[in-house]
Amino acid sequence: MTAGSVCVPQIIPLRVPQPGKANHEIDNNTLLEMKSDTPDVNIYYTLDGSKPEFLKRTGYVENNTFKYTKPITLPDGKIQVKAIAVSKDCRQSGIVTKVFQVGYEPPNVVSPEDNVENVLKDSSRQEFKNGLVGSKLKKKYQNSENQRSWNVNLRKFPDLQVGERTDPKTLKDLRFSESPLEIPAHSGGSGSRPPTRQSQSPGFAHISGLKCLTSTEIMRIQRETDFLKCAHCLAPRPSDPFARFCQECGSPVPPIFGCRLPPPEGAQMGLCAECRSLVPMNTPICVVCEAPLALQLQPQASLHLKEKVICRACGTGNPAHLRYCVTCEGALPSSQESICSGDKASPLPTQKGGTISCSRCGRWNLWEASFCGWCGAMLGIPAGCSVCPKCGASNHLSARFCGSCGICVKSLVKLSLDRSLALAAQEPRPFSEPQCAWQSLNIPLPRSDAGTKRDIGTQTVGLFYPSGKLLAKKELEIASQKQRQEKMSDHKPLLTAISPGRGYWRRQLDHISAHLRCYAQNNPEFRALIAEPRMGKLISATVHEDGCEVSIRLNYSQVSNKNLYLNKAVNFSDHLLSSAAEGDGGLCGSRSSWVSDYSQSTSDTIEKIKRIRNFKTKTFQEKEEQLLPENRLLLKEVGPTGEGRVSVIEQLLDEGADPNCCDEDNRPVITVAVMNKHHEAIPVLVQRGADIDQQWGPLRNTALHEATLLGFAGRESIATLLGCNASIRKKNAGGQTAYDLALNTGDDLITSLFAAKFGQGLEDQLAQTRSLRLDDC
């Protein structure tokens, strides 16, 4: 939060948390408190979901904003409360919104004739009904003289007797003090006291609220106020109120002042299976999670099945006292030969011969094991509780130290096991310990033969580390896999002298690719030429043969035109490549003329390539010479980054700029101006001699074609070009005029520009021509 800002108010319902209800579910008797962490602020709120307006007059119909002065109650229904905190200097906080589901409850009205004694009797009766033995609420409210020393604000009633004597012993029963470790300061005498006003403590605002508390809630509050945590290990305080030591770390814990419940006897405390809390087992439900404890008193592992004898013929389980099977009436095996399926698992084979039985499931485990391998229970400890061998106090099963005397009870498990094994093997142990309370099992152990023992070395380091041979094998596999991937990614077909033919088109393509690669490697000129153009997808491919040579022509789409020669080559191919693919006239119309172009010798081909390269170099040089500084500035002014200013264009033309100059893509300057929407520069360029019908590119479009392709954005350029007498009959490489392109776009405004220029008769004639062309297609 930034400095100087006002904290948002908090909307808090003043009630005891109800189990099974959310925080926003309250009733119409619940008080709502609003407060802000920023001091000296006023809180304004609304109950209809509107924004609080503190500057308007509050309480009127047009404004539903109220000023908070004391806790309020809400009507029943779904209420949306919005509150804002405002400081004295009109600094505002954020608006906090809370939605409450308010239920209807009849108001708790206490008649005047009901005195405090009747109410206290009802609450005391409810407390005894919930199983609590201890203090009486009547004496707590009568002893209100000492409330300052106890830091507890109790509700006072005006009809209490003045000068009533109080008993100091009853002050020890007060459980709801602010600190459980506070020592009450008892006053020596008691005198008369004046009538006091009603307290505003939220904990005792409604005396009838204590009647609504269930036994679980009261026991939960008692558990939270009675049991603290250890200051050393933060473990929960022992359930025994007379415990003086922590059962986890053995540190002394301070005693709790005041009267407490009597300590639970042995085997009365246990872990709840639902919440895993240490709770008394003599209650019907868990005091923490309210789960039933009747089913938890006898664990599943202690539910033993009766001994059965399995029939070898049909597999039916029979009682152990029967001699014949109840299903097939076959003879059952004797008890020595029978396969018993009971509650105990078969013991594991041991090397040392020492075993111990689990007190929960009965499984035999090794004597050095700490936990049972079948159910996980700690070995050597009864299922109920553990008893300290020194003082006889009861502790829970997982306790490491005794809560009464503080000795370590964890190590006594092993001592008891070792002693039981020593007594069973008739071997005296070198220690003498007091007899433990745990009952050890006397197991007859067979004496092992000392002559059969031998020392065997084992290795525990690097068990799962691969050997050197395995690592070398993996390296070879990785190398071979890389070689296979390289061969597959860069497949080079074998160079053969003669292709197979006879329909093996894949081998034919491999032959062409191999010889083309070899030819490019051996001829630097061809390699330089083939590396220049940027080619797209393959448009067409033709094969011609005349008995001596085979000519293969591949036509690719060119991505970008970066030089004059390539532009002209593409323009030339626009008229010839399609005809070559269709085989109907042109330069390659006949097979003989097509083959004659490729029937020259190798030296003639090299010389021709050299001449083409020289012509290309000269064309680039001429183009560089044409791009004078004035032309470059003119192209920049009408380009995408320029502004198309008429005064600058006229100045550049006066300085010697060519109005017919072309950029690096061979686009005329007037076409560049049209494509960049600088229609103001078109009349200036036309007046200075620019060719308005100059064609460019592979499609041979004019400036009017390019303006028509722009659509609605090029309508101003179209009007300007038509005003400068641009030819509408000029066709591009596809045989389309600018008017045809306008009809294809379907823009009525652009079409009307063409119609207004040439008249309605010309429009009808062009439309008729267009319809005939579509019918032919």
UniProtKB/Swiss-Prot annotation:
| Composition-biased stretches (Basic and acidic residues) | 161-176
> What biological-process GO terms show up in the record?
eye photoreceptor cell development
Q: Which Pfam families match?
A: Ank_2 (PF12796), DZR (PF12773), Fn3_assoc (PF13287)
Positions of modified residues (Phosphoserine) = 201
GO-annotated molecular function: zinc ion binding
- The protein's superkingdom reads Eukaryota
Q: State what this protein does.
A: Involved in vesicle transport in photoreceptor cells.
Under which name does UniProt file this protein? Double zinc ribbon and ankyrin repeat-containing protein 1
Species assigned in the record: Macaca fascicularis (Crab-eating macaque)
Gene name of this polypeptide: DZANK1
